[in-house]
UniProtKB/Swiss-Prot annotation:
Residues 1-12 have a biased composition (Polar residues). InterPro entries: Paramyxovir_NSC (IPR003875). This is Protein C. Interacts with the phosphoprotein (via C-terminus); this interaction allows C to associate with the ribonucleocapsid. Its main location: host cell. Keywords: Host cytoplasmic vesicle, Host nucleus. Ribonucleocapsid-associated protein that interacts with the phosphoprotein (P), thereby increasing replication accuracy and processivity of the polymerase complex. The keyword Transmembrane helix does not apply. Belongs to the morbillivirus protein C family. Residues 1-43 are annotated as: Disordered. It is found in: Host nucleus; Host cytoplasmic vesicle. It comes from Measles virus (strain IP-3-Ca).
Length: 186
């Protein structure tokens, strides 16, 4: 049925039950309004602040830290390569302040960080088992890991596994162990 039903009493007038398009009269040059136009415009939504879940923000922060960690590891690797070009014992004795094996342990750890991005306590314990016969090598390994833990920015340590954050907190203990080592070797 059409909108303008014609009644029998007056074919020129619309039925009162028919709905007119709008409350206003239609004027020449005006567009005919459809029923959709006639209804109220949809309620405008208030602009809402963009809500980012805490988990998403945390992931983005971790990604940013991972990028910075990769950069720090590259810098450490470059620094280690400048310390490593020793082929003769005379060159090694020049850099005895840090110790050749300490630097070699640091190079190994930095390579592992670059490749797997993790230094775990299980890896450290395996390395300690290998160096267990030599007290000096064990101390050098611990010193190397402690130095590495202090070279990497603290807010990125959590991304490196569980070894370096635990060593970072034990800084005073490490200094005490180094002093004891020096006093026993003298």
């Amino acid at each position: 049925m059409s909108k303008t039903d014609w009644n029998a009493s007056g074919p020129s007038r619309p039925s009162p039950s028919a709905h007119w398009p709008s409350g206003k009269l239609w004027q020449h040059g005006q567009k005919y309004q459809t029923t959709q136009d006639r209804s109220r415009p949809p309620a405008r939504r208030r602009r809402q602040a963009l809500r980012v879940s805490a988990n998403h923000a945390s992931q983005q922060l971790d990604q940013l830290k991972a990028v910075h960690l990769a950069s720090a590891v590259r810098d450490l690797e470059r620094a280690m390569t400048t310390l490593k070009p020793w082929d003769s014992p005379q060159e090694i004795s020049r850099h005895q302040a840090l110790g050749y094996s300490v630097i070699m342990f640091m190079i190994t750890a930095v390579k592992r960080l670059r490749e797997s991005k993790m230094l775990t306590l299980s890896w450290f314990n395996q390395a300690l088992m290998v160096t267990a016969p030599s007290q000096e090598e064990t101390m050098n390994l611990k010193t190397a890991m402690w130095i590495l833990a202090n070279l990497i920015p603290r807010d990125m340590l959590s991304l490196t596994g569980d070894l370096l954050p635990s060593l970072w907190g034990s800084g005073l203990l490490m200094l005490k162990l180094q002093k004891e080592e020096r006093s026993t070797s003298s």
